[in-house]
Amino acid sequence: VNQQSTASFRDSCGYIFEHGGEIYRCIEPIYHARYRQIMASGLYETLINRSLLIQHIEIAPGSMPFAPMEKITLKPQKLNLITYPFEWCFCQLKSAALQLLEIQAIAMEFGMTLRDATPFNHQFKGSRVIFIDTLSFDEYQEGTPWIPYRQFCENFLAPLVVAKFRDPSFLKFASLSLQGIPLDIAVKLLPFEGYLNFGILVHLVGHAKLANAKGGEGTSKHRVLSRTGLVALIDSLRRSVESLSMPSNRRSTWSEYRSESNYNSDDILEKESVVQTFIRTLSPKTVLDIGCNDGRFSRIAVKCGVASVVAIDSDHLVIDRLVRSLIQ
């Protein structure tokens, strides 16, 4: 018997299950036509070629005991590490936001659109973000608005804005609420400087006022938005996200550790030698660098041939700097 993952309870189109230590995804008949459209239109191939979407292989119906005839069963590429948005640094969430907007823009070229916009649909392969929800697409209908607009603003834009202007610890808000930061709360946290950013003014401040005027409702499914208008909306969101960055002069407990520590050059070289010897002796497949700071020893592990290196630090700024150095 295949055990359905409890993480799939919200998706009526399909579910995740595990069999023999492997992860599979079963697509319900209600989504078969959309899935075939994704595959036949060229959207899947385009996203794969651009390294934006997780790859999968399709299991022939009835070919295996766990692949029922009436459903489509996929075996997605397995990731070495699963992380969650409240564990990410600023630039990781920003990368996921920009990727989602890029995918939305591409999907429209193939007559499709994203039906939700949650950071939980993204993971990381190394330092690169990748979209993992193949069932998140729907057919685009001319004149319809972007349904997950508010969801995007609350789950991506609002956390990034508040982290920039207040404190990066607000990125952990996702551990308390899977719905992100409510628009009205995000606006209350904005300093005056935030109102000078046109994108923030439109997509957070104006959006919050409009939502409050409608009694807290999200994007209206009855609103008419032309294709040109939707393309402009996605582009405006992209520019708004791109304009956000962490202040370069912000400091934290460990952000200046390398320059202010008591280690001299000989001490550092000796420590590097010890780490190299340790790794080459044990030949581990995975190394966990706890308190990695700028990732000096994580990089050494990679150079020594370790297949998977996980760098962890509780200091948001040092992790943000490390990730930025890897993706630039």
Q: What is each of the regions a protein language model found here?
A:
Residues 113, 118-164:
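Catalytic activation segment of kinase domains across protein kinase-like and atypical kinase folds
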Residues 283-293:
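Conserved class I S-adenosyl-L-methionine
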Residues 56-95:
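Conserved structural core of kinase catalytic domains
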Residues 308-313:
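Conserved SAM-binding motif I beta-strand of class I
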